[in-house]
Swiss-Prot record:
One of its GO terms (molecular function) is ATP binding. NCBIfam families: PRK10696.1. The keyword Magnesium applies. This is tRNA-cytidine(32) 2-sulfurtransferase. Its cofactor is Mg(2+); [4Fe-4S] cluster. The gene is ttcA. Its EC number is 2.8.1.-. Pathway: tRNA modification.
Length: 274
């Protein structure tokens, strides 16, 4: 790339700043960490790697970066693209080969969405590999819009009020997942990916499934944002500002024990002035 334009420079600085803020706010990366950056070949993971490589140079702490891609043996997967890109960058990398494609095609009926099973199989394989190489953090490329979409997916279709946290410890306690792009918008990431001309690898397994529930939610949020700019950011801020006493989850707040506080100062009305 040549010299960046003013707007391109602003975009790059904004993504780096927001990623840095998210990393700091959630203590995502600590001194001595070995960060396994999960690369899918999509715009989000390329942007995440690009931003993390910059932050590695300027951060006051030292941490390692290891890029990992999972070759799921999808037909037509361009095996050469990521190794060539990572070699040019001079980044340590691993390609994990696991034929989850055949498993998904065998278990999921034709016409049904494959995302859930594919994601579980991929996540399990990557968790195991992170453990094998001694990675202390596992970085995923989910962004702010992904987090908000997941919140609505769980609310609309699962009846639960949960999203996708910026930092998560796996159930077995062996892996810590971080999402450095948690504060970044998909719009900015797409613009940055276009600007950098990353060698995008399309997902042939699920990319054509246009009737996904996530796409329905995404379309809804896009329409909201079009009519009311800033709404997505406001929803994300709400996820950071939860008041359990104002919801209805008895496991989060002890509603059953609520009683009048007899020691509280009484309030009296001046009846004559009503």
């Amino acid at each position: 790339m040549g010299t960046l334009s003013v707007n391109q420079n602003k975009l790059q600085k904004r993504l780096r700043r927001l990623a840095g803020e998210a990393i700091t706010d959630y203590n995502m990366i600590e001194d001595g960490d070995k960060v396994m950056v999960c690369l899918s070949g999509g715009k989000d993971s390329y942007t995440m790697l690009d931003v993390l490589l910059h932050l590695q140079k300027v951060a006051p702490i030292k941490f390692e970066i290891v890029a990992v891609n999972m070759d799921q043996k999808q037909p037509g997967f361009p095996e050469h693209v990521l190794p060539a890109y990572l070699k040019e960058l001079g980044v340590e990398y691993h390609i994990v080969e696991k034929d989850t494609y055949s498993v998904v095609k065998e278990l999921v009926p034709e016409g049904k969405t494959t995302c859930s099973l594919c994601s579980r199989l991929r996540r399990g394989t990557l968790y195991t590999f992170a453990d094998e190489i001694g990675a202390t953090k596992m970085a995923l490329g989910h962004h702010r819009d992904d987090i908000v979409e997941t919140f609505f997916l769980n609310m609309f279709f699962n009846g639960s009020l949960k999203g996708m946290p910026p930092k998560l410890r796996a159930d077995d306690g062996r892996n810590v997942v971080i999402r450095p792009l948690a504060y970044c918008s998909e719009k900015d990431i797409q613009a940055y990916s276009d600007m950098k001309e990353f060698p995008i690898i399309p997902c042939n397994l699920c990319g054509s499934q246009e009737n996904l529930q996530r796409q329905v939610v995404k379309d809804m949020l896009v329409e909201w944002e079009r009519k009311h700019p800033g709404r997505t950011e406001s929803i994300f801020r709400a996820l950071q500002n939860v008041a359990p006493s104002q919801l209805a989850d008895r496991n989060l707040f002890d509603f059953t024990s609520l009683k009048i506080d007899e020691s509280a100062t009484p309030r009296f009305l001046d009846v004559l002035n009503i």
